[in-house]
Amino acid sequence: STYTMTIDVTAVNDAPTANDDTINVVSGTPATGNVVTSNDTDPDGDTLSVSAIAGGSPGSPITGTYGTFTLDSDGSYTYTVDTSNADVIAWQSGDPPLTETFTYTASDGNGETNTATITVNVSGSNDAPTAADNTVTTNEDTDHTFSESEFGFSDVDGDSLDHVSIETLPSN
């Protein structure tokens, strides 16, 4: 005997895949990009968006440990380093990066979501030293050896004084 069987296949919405991201940023230069278009996918081809971010909401700045992070609903982001942060100021070339993380939720717009973590690696920069104006008085025809303290040298990075250039001297 012969049987006829009908099978109905109903498509279901599959969850998107939100992949972890790493952002490398240097103090003084904001980092920008897009966490959704860089590596997140949806098996159904749905357009993905950021529906949530831990500690805030899409489009609103979040103050992190080392800077401010803004993640918009389209996945675009900006991370700006807080150049007044003591750890950022103290960062030296060769030090490991300062790291903080943010977790976001990607949505396919049809009820399915997935989460991923954004790791931000912050590197400082070599900041210029400062010097304070100073007057040094010495007797005529007498040698004077300048000391570092007479130049009011200061460096937030902790670097030592390398050299000094005297550009003008008073005339008699």
Regions picked out by a protein language model, each given a short descriptive name:
Residues 1-11, 59-128, 137-165, 169-172:
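Acidic, turn/loop-rich segments in luminal/extracellular domains of secretory-pathway
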Residues 19, 39-40:
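Short, structured coil/turn linkers that connect adjacent secondary-structure elements
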Residues 49-62:
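Flexible "stalk/tail and boundary" regions
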